[in-house]
From Swiss-Prot:
Signal peptide: none annotated. SUPFAM superfamilies: MFS general substrate transporter. It is a multi-pass membrane protein. It comes from Bacillus subtilis (strain 168). GO terms for cellular component: plasma membrane. This is Purine efflux pump PbuE. Belongs to the major facilitator superfamily. DHA1 family. PbuE (TC 2.A.1.2.25) subfamily. GO terms for biological process: transmembrane transport. Induction: Up-regulated by adenine, via the adenine-dependent riboswitch. Also up-regulated by hypoxanthine and guanine.
Length: 388
């Protein structure tokens, strides 16, 4: 495996932190800015929507820019966004910082995902993608629990300053170890958008969207879930986040290896089906930590196991527009996060109990399984692809 893949993954740790760390510190942000937990949860939704909209659009607008230079520019904007978050005097300013962070993150992740599979042998393609997503999941394992502990001692703002410093380190690493990466000739953006009209491709993106929507219906409010069901202190909540994160870190490589071994077809069905089952088991296991922890670990493993298979699948069925399809898929992932966070907030507000978010989340993942069957059973329209 090319060591540069791991360097790209290291860069995604910083950008993963800024998105994922907020879920663990919602109570602190809400208290400091005098807003409700549900309102604070919008920080997750706004980031996800900003990422989803800007990712494909910025990729198209910057198609002619040399990729290393673009990567460094995106990292610098990301650094500035974290400074804005650190100094934000109110909720509105913090929201602005989230939009800036989302736009730069969208470019950084898509560039990482498009570069990584091109610098490894074809048989390692899914694993390379899995390693990139391992950077995101590492942010859960290390950042979220440490973020909870650090914010309890020094406040939540210091976290964004630290993430900004990580972005500067990433800029240094990329500038030293990567040579110029010429921009490749791309199909016009308007033509690439037309591929979404292909039911096989569109359904694949919907699998990602509904899987993440189901996941984040609960995960966006995981800290309150642990406090309500298991009556855990902040320390033990951070421990659970850490254990979840460790399993999620393993999810990316596991999903990549599974896809390379079984093929993307079987992997997608296996992961989505298992994910739906585990979502329904989560609230049933909260009678004891002995029952809950194994279920939670499996949940964490599966949460990042789908992405490598999905990205590899899209490269297989749409090779002529694979770059933009990977961007669309990460956008679908972010739309799912935003949708799930919003649905979780509504469910929590209407029912008054965070436990109901797990039941709702599991039901949403079932929709993802149905779309997986639709996509996987449709033939590849080679003629249509070649016309692009």
């Amino acid at each position: 495996m090319n060591f540069k893949v791991f360097l790209l993954a290291a860069s995604t740790i910083a950008v993963g932190l800024v998105e994922l760390i907020v879920g663990g510190i919602l109570p602190q942000i809400a208290n400091d800015l005098d807003i409700s937990i549900v309102s604070a949860g919008q920080l997750i939704s706004v980031f996800a929507l900003g990422y989803a909209v800007s990712g494909p659009l910025l990729l198209a607008l910057t198609a002619k820019i040399e990729r290393k230079r673009l990567y460094l520019i995106a990292l610098f904007v990301f650094f500035l966004s974290n400074l804005v978050a650190y100094f934000s005097p109110n909720f509105a300013t913090l929201m602005v910082s989230r939009v800036l962070a989302a736009m730069s993150t969208g470019l950084i992740v898509v560039l990482s995902l498009t570069i990584a599979p091109k610098i490894v042998a074809p048989e390692y393609r899914a694993r390379a993608i899995g390693i990139i997503f391992m950077g995101f999941s590492s942010a859960i394992a290390l950042g979220v629990p440490l973020g909870i502990l650090i914010s309890d001692s020094f406040g939540w703002r210091i976290l964004f300053l630290g993430i900004g410093l990580l972005a500067l380190i990433s800029m240094l690493i990329i500038s030293i170890f990567f040579e110029r990466i010429p921009a490749e000739k791309m199909i016009p953006f308007r033509e690439q958008l037309k591929t979404i009209g292909n039911l096989k491709i569109a359904s694949s993106h919907l699998v990602t969207m509904f899987t993440l929507a189901g996941h984040y219906t609960l995960y966006a409010y995981f800290a309150p879930f642990l406090e309500e069901t298991l009556h855990l202190s902040s320390f033990w909540v951070s421990i659970c986040y850490f254990l979840f994160g460790i399993s999620a870190v393993c999810g990316g490589p596991f999903g990549g290896a599974l896809s390379d071994r079984l093929g993307s077809f079987k992997s997608i069905l296996l992961v989505t089906g298992s994910f739906a089952i585990i979502m329904f088991l989560l609230p049933l296991s909260t009678s004891s930590m002995i029952f809950f922890l194994p279920v939670m670990v499996i949940w964490g493993l599966l949460s990042w196991s789908l992405a490598p298979a999905q990205q590899s699948y899209l490269i297989e069925i749409a090779p002529d527009s694979s770059d933009i399809q990977q961007s669309f898929n990460t956008s679908a992932l972010q739309v799912g996060i935003a949708l799930g966070s919003a649905i979780g907030g509504v469910v929590l507000d209407q029912t008054g109990t965070v436990v109901s978010t797990a039941w709702c989340g599991g039901s949403i993942v079932i929709i993802a399984v149905l779309f997986a069957f639709i996509s996987l059973t449709r033939p590849v329209q080679t003629a249509k692809k070649s016309s692009l």
